[in-house]
Amino acid sequence: MTQLMITGDGNTPLSPEELADLIPNLATREELNEWERENILRAREWAVGDRTGSNDMVGDEYVGKLHQKMFDQTWKWAGQYRRTERNIGIPVQEIREKLVALFGDVRYWIANQTFSPDEIAVRFHHRLVAIHPFPNGNGRHARLMADLFLMKLGRPAFTWGSRELVRQGEARARYLDAVRAADNGDMQPLLEFVRL
């Protein structure tokens, strides 16, 4: 097993086939995290300048395009929905159907002001993570989607516990606990965490 295949709590393991689609020549998980971080920073810069409105970003095309921008220098499959089952997320054949339902729900929540903008963004993030549409990067993608959604509404991006969440540590553990609470219907811990 290579160092790249070793995952921590909350990290999605990749298949050997998915690992073979790594673009740069990296040997360790730390190198991969740093490479992806740089790729994501470029994607964030692109997304902040993008003129897509909040309603239009809640759709299949934008979700895939953002993931592609976030990982296009890292993975050949960037922006493509996963084709293999995971220890997290829904069955592969349900991904598109569940995303369409999520997009409809978010648009309804916006139009009817069902929840505050923060709660809509948290629920959007949580459902994206639960669906787990991509082979890797789902949490980072969902967090950036939530931040961009808020910014399009003129609100500040979330702080996400004011810590780096990719590496193992107290902030990541608290984030994962909040996501698991949301899995059980309690959104409050995640709502609190995103504004710490």
Where are these regions (language model features)?
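FIC/Doc superfamily catalytic core
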Residues: 1-196
